[in-house]
């Protein structure tokens, strides 16, 4: 079990997370100087916050990063608590871009993308160091191209990590622990919800958990309904990082973190009885099992965010705006 499951899974997960962090850091370097200003100026209403939260999360490839930034801005007094509600809903929609890309089965592009990204980075590094082209060396676009090469490298590593993790699917399928879990999940899909929440809270990445589930569903190791339950749980578990980030902050910052939990948990609990319908819709959209999981994640987050959006306009939330 150690050699066939744990070691390959940990290696694949490490490569996947390395790719995710490279993408996040490089994209944050590209957008970082403008992100705080955009969030501050463009979130006057919940619907504006939803739009900005969606775009910034899709660009940064990290809902956690945007949520933590929002909490930090609230703690610093740059944003008020009511203005973050739309941002939180938007991050849930924007994060679907990652799972949709994984669901496209672009694994064959990993090596070409890695070679291309390394070539781009080396070219920009040489142009920046050599004094043969002073005009190019001082060009403003050079750092942007360099950061773009790091983004491509991160995406290539993400695809490589997914391939490695999905490769242990058959070994996991034969393990007694997985058989026990499937038996319990056949009795109640709530086991899948709990597993998704706990695993995502432990690894701090809903994309990694959902990616693994895509692999299991693709090889038939897990039924689509159970996979959807795990996805719903992952949307709850992803709130753990925001809760940790709010510790020691202001009451307003803590309200943001707990609002994230309430909105995500409420949406998951609301859609649990409709897992069969979600599975039917996703099967109608895509014939690929991985694509079905990705589309379910997208449908769930869009619908739950739109359902919750009108409640963000209630006067109650304006009164819940402590100064400290």
Give a label for each model feature.
Residues 1-50, 144-198, 216-219:
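Helix-loop-helix hairpins and the membrane-proximal interhelical loops
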Residues 2-8, 85-88, 101-165:
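Signature of multi-pass transmembrane helix bundles
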Residues 3, 7, 145, 149, ...:
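Alpha-helical transmembrane segments of multi-pass inner-membrane proteins
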Residues 20, 24, 98, 203, ...:
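Alpha-helical transmembrane segments of multipass membrane proteins
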Residues 21-29, 70-77, 124-136, 242-250:
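C-terminal ends of transmembrane helices
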Residues 22-30, 34, 100, 164-171, ...:
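Membrane-spanning helices that line or support transport/gating and their immediate boundary helices
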Residues 57-60, 65-92, 99-122, 200-238, ...:
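Membrane-interfacial helix-loop connectors
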Residues 162, 174, 178-182, 253-324:
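Transmembrane alpha-helical segments and their short flanking loops
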């Amino acid at each position: 079990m150690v050699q066939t499951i744990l070691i390959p899974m940990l290696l694949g997960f490490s490569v996947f997370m390395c790719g995710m962090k490279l993408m996040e850091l490089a994209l944050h370097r590209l957008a970082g100087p403008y992100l705080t200003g955009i969030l501050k100026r463009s979130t006057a209403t919940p619907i504006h916050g939803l739009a900005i939260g969606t775009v910034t999360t899709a660009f940064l490839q990290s809902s956690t990063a945007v949520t933590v930034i929002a909490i930090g801005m609230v703690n610093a007094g740059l944003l008020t608590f009511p203005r973050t509600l739309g941002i939180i809903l938007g991050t849930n929609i924007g994060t679907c871009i990652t799972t949709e890309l994984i669901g496209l089965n672009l694994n064959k592009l990993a090596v070409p993308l890695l070679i291309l990204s390394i070539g781009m980075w080396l070219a920009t590094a040489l142009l920046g160091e050599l004094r043969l082209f002073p005009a190019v060396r001082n060009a403003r676009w050079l750092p942007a191209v360099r950061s773009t090469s790091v983004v491509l490298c991160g995406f290539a590593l993400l695809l490589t990590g997914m391939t490695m993790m999905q490769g242990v699917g058959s070994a996991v399928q034969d393990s007694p622990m997985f058989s026990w879990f499937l038996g319990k999940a056949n009795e109640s899909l709530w086991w899948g919800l709990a597993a998704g929440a706990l695993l995502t809270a432990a690894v701090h990445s809903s994309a990694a958990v959902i990616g693994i589930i895509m692999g299991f569903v693709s090889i038939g190791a897990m039924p689509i309904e159970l996979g959807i339950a795990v996805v719903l749980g992952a949307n709850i578990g992803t709130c753990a990082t925001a809760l940790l980030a709010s510790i020691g902050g202001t009451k307003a910052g803590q309200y943001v973190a707990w609002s994230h939990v309430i909105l995500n948990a409420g949406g998951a609990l609301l859609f649990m009885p409709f897992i069969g319908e979600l599975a039917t819709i996703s099967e109608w959209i895509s014939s690929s099992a991985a694509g079905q999981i990705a589309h379910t994640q997208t449908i769930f987050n869009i619908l739950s965010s739109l359902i919750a959006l009108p409640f963000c306009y209630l006067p109650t939330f304006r009164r819940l705006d402590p100064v400290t």
